[in-house]
Amino acid sequence: MDLPVDEWKSYLLQKWASLPTSVQVTISTAETLRDIFLHSSSLLQPEDELFLKRLSKGYLVGKDLDAPLFYREEGNKKFQEKDYTGAAVLYSKGVSHSRPNTEDMSLCYANRSAALFHLGEYETCLKDINRAQTHGYPERLQPKIMLRKAECLVALGRLQEASQTISDLERNFTATPTLANVRPQTLQRNLHHLKMKVQEKDKLTETFPAALAKTLEDAALREENEQLSSASSSVGLCIDPLKGRYLVATKDILPGELLVKEDAFVSVLNPGELPPPHHGLDSKWDTRVTNGDLYCHRCLKHTLATVPCDGCSYAKYCSQECLQQAWELYHRTECPLGGLLLTLGVFCHIALRLTLLVGFEDVRKIITKVCDKISNKDICLPESNNQVKTLNYGLGESEKSGNIIETPIPGCDINGKYENNYNAVFNLLPHTENHSPEHKFLCALCVSALCRQLEAASFQAIPTERSVNSSQLQAAVTPELCPDVTIWGVAMLRHMLQLHCNAQAMTTIQHTGSKGSIVTDSRQVRLATGIFPVVSLLNHSCSPNTSMSFISTVAAIQASQRIRKGQEILHCYGPHKSRMGVAERQQKLRSQYFFDCACPACQTEAHRMAAEPRWEAFCCNSCGAPMQGDDVLHCGSRSCAESAVSRDHLVSRLQDLQQQVGVAQKLLRDGELERAVQQLLGCQRDAESFLWAEHALVGEIADGLARACAALGDWQKAATHLQRSLRVVEVRHGPSSVEMGHELFKLAQIFFNGFAVPEALSTIQKAEEALLLHCGPWDDEIQELQKMKSCLLDLPPTPVGPAV
């Protein structure tokens, strides 16, 4: 959650409401963020901090020495059910609560290695085996884990190492026969079996060469931009007194071209929307799975084999290297504040991490620099009086506006270069004047509470790039913050307000499927929140000409359509014309970003407000024509005699149907496939009686039927249902949309598994064409499509194949 937990938010808003009017006016009319921060922090009382401390204790982020056994036993249950992914996550939770170099930690690592082995994650399994041995895996259990190590090595084709491992195991067994009841002959037999298995897989290995595994790190911008870091030379930076900074095309741009490839200046993993559990006797430890269990807290890489922080049970990493980097850069300060940071929300957490990454000295320098350039009144609003005439960076001299630049573009250095650095971050707009007084008060008290905790710790853990006078950092704890902490607090308050408009949701595609299904469904989930100074220069459009994707902490902006030279490069902030109507979009953009959208999509829709989108339309029960009207709907066909019907009645029917579809989706998730099919077929019949053929719910029902039929192995019916869903997706999102790409990916899976080779190859090509516009060749789905295509092309010709 971006803002604090509801209890703390409500508490502070009540505190604001109870303040004398004169105090509210003082804060509301404060001219600088420094004044807002100092006025607000003076109102933070010990009882407020005590209440916040109680809330923070709801998050169990410390290590509980009784937890490893609990999680190991819960993991064993999942393992016996053959839910190896679920087992691995629970073993990871056990690892997070274990102390280093203990039997608890070694057993959790060893058990997790078994789950990873069954998932085919052999390299990762070997790492866990080494970790288990490093942390003191019991001698009595060594044969079991050594055999697993040999099996991994054979599966990876490292037969010489496997033979050496077996020899070591046999030698140990001979020396100490009481270690285990595993015979050397059994080990040799297993080794021989695995060698044969590797030989059989040789051809398959050649079919999927390593060259297919393209990553975003391999993707390069066509030509680096000299004035705009992380951007292509096809992109130019401009500024206008009315619209501010924005990006334009300096040359014609083709669909799919990579325009920006930027690493987040700072990012924080989103803990998810799950509230802290109520810690009773029956639920002392949390078994729920969140993003924090599946992704590295530093680089955001997906992993089932997390390495925990030695000091807390919350922070987890994909490797020892990420753990060490995080500790040195920021986590040594954040570690003891884990529960507090989760209570205060992601924005406050990012504000702290940002200042920790930069270092106290550099934060103070840039604030001092701003103070020297402009009046103290504008210390936190450098953009307020810096109105700049139009300037185009990246366009030729003859194409510049000819206007004289009065001041540099905010965020650029003295040479006019805009880079991914703290100067650029600091110059992102906080929109202080647009935020409500109570919101600024809430943010200021959150930062104040955090500063009090940092001050209480005497800043002993705060990393700085240069030595700082110890007397400045180790001031005694007093109700009034010392001047240095005030600078820190003002910077964090500015960043909290900036994040309201400049935070970038870092998303990933998560694949899900019903039990037993080999055809996956996908959904976009918010993984983390970050700040990208260059990406933040993009203005919004409800019908943008770019798409954004993420790999790890890197954002990639690609052209989703042809962009002409001089045309503005636009990004969607969330409200997209294919997902919501113009009124809802306008409201969301106004409340979060403080502007009224006037993009072509909004202007077009504003002129035809009466016509509702086809994916929300009702149809006539008699003739099937679309219904028209506002509160009372009539059949759109003049020849139809069907009587009018109220919109409320149809909306009520729609809500009932949505509930029934929800029941079917749960049956599908639980693996009750036959019941799910019957439920969905009933929903489909009901939908046909009052919903337009391209209604979104009609597509959702068809998609559910396709997944259920695929799980049952009925590929022909699955393809038929999914093609109906495709028509709905195409009408709503367009034939080249990323949504269309995801749906075509599913259809390709169905044709592939149904052995319909021509249909599969044709669909794979269409899916690749759509996805490459939005995701790039590093995307998991694109790489899976390439593997399917490679497999199909290598098949020998067959005269007859199963029909789909």
UniProtKB/Swiss-Prot annotation:
Pfam families recorded: SET, zf-MYND
Gene Ontology MF: a single term: zinc ion binding
Domain SET: 233-574
Reaction(s) the record says it catalyses: L-lysyl-[protein] + S-adenosyl-L-methionine = N(6)-methyl-L-lysyl-[protein] + S-adenosyl-L-homocysteine + H(+)
Renumbered zinc finger spans (MYND-type): 296-335
EC numbers, comma separated: 2.1.1.-
A GO CC annotation given for this chain: nucleus
First-tier enzyme category under EC: transferase
Record's signal peptide: none
Positions contributing to Zn(2+) 1 binding: 296, 299, 318, 322
SUBUNIT field: Interacts (via MYND-type zinc finger) with HDAC1.
Family: Belongs to the class V-like SAM-binding methyltransferase superfamily.
Protein name: Protein-lysine N-methyltransferase SMYD4
Gene: SMYD4
